[in-house]
A protein has these predicted regions:
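A short helix-loop-beta-strand connector motif used in the catalytic cores of GNAT acetyltransferases and
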Residues: 44-56
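Residue-level marker of structural boundaries
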Residues: 21-24, 33, 48, 88
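Hydrophobic alpha-helical core bundles mediating ligand binding, dimerization, or RNAP-core interactions
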Residues: 15-20, 39, 43
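Conserved GNAT-fold acetyl-CoA-binding loop/helix
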Residues: 23-41
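Short amphipathic alpha-helical segments and helix-helix/interface helices
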Residues: 43-44, 125
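Acyl-donor (CoA/ACP) binding surface of acyl/acetyltransferases
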Residues: 1-14, 18-19, 54-154
């Protein structure tokens, strides 16, 4: 059974490992590895930030991955996901996206969730579509062609 909880200070190194995993870096808009010092500052600021929700997903005792949702304007938030390498390809992504999106939108009914995904990231595109996101448009973000997907309250 897939469950989630809010990220805590004890998750800092787990997030550090996930964020620097090779495939995660290659699908990010900033592909350079992240230093531990930079990550620590970022992580501890984010878990305290009232505009950010960081969720750790588990399947029993196994940590599956994380989703981060950040409010960036009055009625807009962006969502991002990463899955532990050994749990990819097991249909966790769309379930995590759907659960986290519903959790956020149930508590923020006037918001739209926005996902910005590299054109080359076919698995993420499929997962977001399966979780109820629709293609809003395409753009070039930091020299990367990407798609903009949106989900609003159902």
């Amino acid at each position: 059974m897939l469950t989630f909880r809010k990220a805590e200070a004890k998750d800092m190194m787990l997030y550090f490992e996930w964020v620097n995993e090779k495939l995660v870096r290659s699908q990010s808009f900033s592909t350079k590895p992240i230093s531990l010092d930079d990550h620590k500052k970022w992580f501890f600021n984010k878990i305290k930030d009232q505009n950010t929700i960081m969720l750790v997903f588990s399947n029993g005792v196994n940590k599956i991955g994380q989703i981060r949702i950040e409010k960036y304007s009055k009625k807009k938030a962006k969502i991002g996901i990463s899955i532990e390498k050994k749990h990819r390809g097991k249909n966790f992504a769309f379930k995590m996206i759907d659960i986290a999106s519903s959790y956020f939108l149930d508590n923020n009914t006037d918001f739209a969730l926005n996902a910005f995904i590299k054109e080359s990231n076919k698995r993420s595109i499929k997962s977001f579509e399966k979780a109820g996101y629709y293609l809003f448009g395409s753009l070039t973000n930091k020299k990367n062609k990407s798609f903009h997907f949106i989900r609003k309250i159902k």
